[in-house]
Amino acid sequence: MLTIDEGGQLRGFEYASEPEFSKWLMHLVATETSTTSAGRSNQQSVASTLVQLSLRGEGPQTFKALQEACGASYPTVAAAVKEFTEQGFIEHQSDRRIVLKYLTHEAWLKIARAHGANRKVLRFVDPTGQARTPAAMAKRLFKLQAQGVAQNVAVGGVLGAMHYFPGLDITASPRLDLSNYGQGTDFVQKLDAALELTSDPRAKAVVVVHVTQEPPRFIEHDQGETWASELECIADLIEMGLTREVVDMVSDLNHRKMHAKEGRTP
C-alpha cells in the first residue's frame, strides 16, 4: 500500500525512496488532487466572460457573441444568462442583447468566489526556503515570455491587482499567483529551479498556478509584461483572504466604469 506521511514523504512502495520516481509520483498526486471546479464550470465561465467583457468596455452582447467569446454552447449560455438574470445582475435590451448591471460589493465577491472555484489550483513550495521574491519571479517570467516561453501564462494575485489598481494597500506580495490559460507547468522550474509541486494545503506556497477556463483574450500585454484579467486577480485576492483589499479594488473598478459610461476621465 502506498501512502504519503504527514511530512509529505512516500511510504510503503519499493521505489518510494528513488528521488526521481518519488518526485514524479508526488507531482502526479498533487496535480490530480488539486482544487478543481464543480460540474457547472461552463455556466460559470459564461458568467465570468460577461463580467470581463463589461470591464473591458465591450458593451451589450448577443448570445452568439458570448458563445464565441467563451466557446460554450447556446444552452449553456442561455442557462448562465438565466441564472445571472434571476440574481439581478443582467439587463435585457430591446434588441435582445444583454448587458451587465452595476455590481455591488457583495455581487462582486459572489461572482469572484464562483470564478475562483471554477479553476484548478496548483501550489508550489520551496524546500530550501531561499526562493526568489514574487516580483523577481514575475520579472523572470516576462523575460522568458520575450523568448517565446509560457505565452499563455499571466501574472495575477497581488502583483496583478496592483497593475490595475496601484492604490492597493498591500506592502508586498506574499506569493506569485499565475493564471494558466492552457499552458503546462514545466515553465515553473525556470522561474526558480528549487520549486516543487505540493499536495499539502497547509504548506506555504511561494507560487500558485491557477488553471483557468477564461479565454486568453483577456490577458493584458503592457510594455513587455503579461497580466491576468481583473477578475482573475480579484479571485486570487479572495483566495488569500484579502477581502478588504478586494472591496477597495472593485470600488475603483466601479468608479472607472461609471466615468467611462459618462464619457469622462476618472
PLM-predicted stretches and their roles:
Residues P19-T49:
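Short alpha-helical segments that sit at the start of domains
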Residues G39-Q43, D95-G116:
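Short, cationic-aromatic polyanion-contact patches
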Residues G71-E86:
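Short amphipathic alpha-helical interaction segments
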Residues M1-H27, A114-P266:
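Long, low-complexity, charge-rich intrinsically disordered regions
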Residues T85-R96:
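A short, conserved structural fragment
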